[in-house]
Amino acid sequence: MLKNLFRKTKYITVSQKNIENYKRENTPTIPDGMWVKCNKCGEILYQNDLEKNYMVCNLCGNHFRIGVKERIKYLFDKDTFKEWDYKIKTENPLDFKGYDEKIEHIKEKTNLSEAVTTGKGKIAGMEAVVCIMDSKFMMGSMGCVVGEKITRAIERAIKLRLPVIIFTASGGARMQEGILSLMQMAKVSSALAKLDEEGLLYICVLTDPTTGGVTASFAMLGDIILAEPDALIGFAGKRVIEQTINEKLPEDFQKSEFLLEHGFIDKIVPRSDLRKVLAKLINMHQNSF
């Protein structure tokens, strides 16, 4: 009797495999990419709602970085954009180790041929030549192909008598191409000088981030310079400047709002209003002749 009283209770052994199967079968399946966390306010956002709102957080107004496809979708009249020069191939002029492999890997990953896409399309029925930089391709860095594509686009705009709009998003010159990369600053700036001589409109839209050699050249040469809210815009990094001058810089230093306040840009335009504002500017310029 006492022996039965203190007998060890029998229990069922559940294998780890059964536990994992149970969890898998009873856990709701949520597809990847359905929810996105806002990196400014921390709110979890539904991807479809975010896309309908131009990739802008509806709670804090944070403008997510967007690529070429989204920019074309939000800017142009449907099915009017025609891409130019997408077959120009990136070379390795300095035989920089690993550069060829890196370019091929990024091409496959992003489905982009380079850090800028150029072409012609219609905005509210009006034609314009547009260059769109994409930070997903080597941080939008400017190499020989980027400079060549933008220069060709400007030259075609002169022949077609069309305005030029450039959306900047770049970390600056591409170090793997050395001095040839830096040369693109002068090359694009020279083409823009010819555009100006022809009396044609150049609008630059600064997006997050616009830095380095791009800022030091064509990004700041626009007849009209627009920017998206809270965009990082500058030449050298904030910490580099602070270490150089041994001073603490303002918290909002190099933000588009700071630049507007100090007269470096003309207007900050929310993404939802950008198409309307650009159409108005193009129309005003066309009607002034």
UniProtKB/Swiss-Prot annotation:
Residues 34-289 form the CoA carboxyltransferase N-terminal domain. Its main location: cytoplasm. Its cofactor is Zn(2+). Keywords: ATP-binding, Cytoplasm, Fatty acid biosynthesis, Fatty acid metabolism, Lipid biosynthesis, Lipid metabolism, Metal-binding, Nucleotide-binding, Transferase, Zinc, Zinc-finger. InterPro entries: AcCoA_carboxyl_beta, Acetyl_CoA_COase_Trfase_b_su, ClpP/crotonase-like_dom_sf, COA_CT_N, Znf-ACC. The keyword DNA damage does not apply. It is found in: Cytoplasm. PROSITE patterns: COA_CT_NTER. Zn(2+) binds at C38, C41, C57, C60. It catalyses: N(6)-carboxybiotinyl-L-lysyl-[protein] + acetyl-CoA = N(6)-biotinyl-L-lysyl-[protein] + malonyl-CoA. It is an enzyme of class 2 (transferase). It holds the Pfam family Carboxyl_trans. Belongs to the AccD/PCCB family. Acetyl-CoA carboxylase is a heterohexamer composed of biotin carboxyl carrier protein (AccB), biotin carboxylase (AccC) and two subunits each of ACCase subunit alpha (AccA) and ACCase subunit beta (AccD). Component of the acetyl coenzyme A carboxylase (ACC) complex. Biotin carboxylase (BC) catalyzes the carboxylation of biotin on its carrier protein (BCCP) and then the CO(2) group is transferred by the transcarboxylase to acetyl-CoA to form malonyl-CoA. This is Acetyl-coenzyme A carboxylase carboxyl transferase subunit beta. It comes from Clostridium botulinum (strain Okra / Type B1). The gene is accD.
